[in-house]
């Protein structure tokens, strides 16, 4: 299985990156894993012009989204990874997701979706808004829920705990 991780953290070497690396190490035991850090891509927000619907999925914007579409086209599973900012995904990852409002998405072979989230707060509702959207996306695209790792109380670089990294690793290792 080809697994693409879209990592939405703007911070290099932070908690999201640590969890992504742990997951990827586990998953790489049985699968091909590709990590794409959206912070390294130049992607503008969707302009809602619908040019993509008139041109077989070709976006009017000339940026790195075409590269991301290509990566997504080769994936069997997609993992969205993000720090939580104001109960939502990072702006970088949300921008990429919004740009999937494009008919090119219908050519993707993605069958499974997973989620890695890390936030500084510890309240029980921290991930509710994102997991609600996640489940709506699963239903809309008829995707299998491959699982998730949700980490609370990790603000500064390295705050993620060893058992949380192990959880991400074991989730990756367990994928069939």
Where are the predicted features?
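Short glycine-rich anion-binding loops that position phosphate/pyrophosphate groups of nucleotides
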Residues: 84-86, 120-121
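Structural signal for conserved beta-strand scaffold positions within catalytic alpha/beta enzyme cores
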Residues: 35-37, 61, 115, 147-150
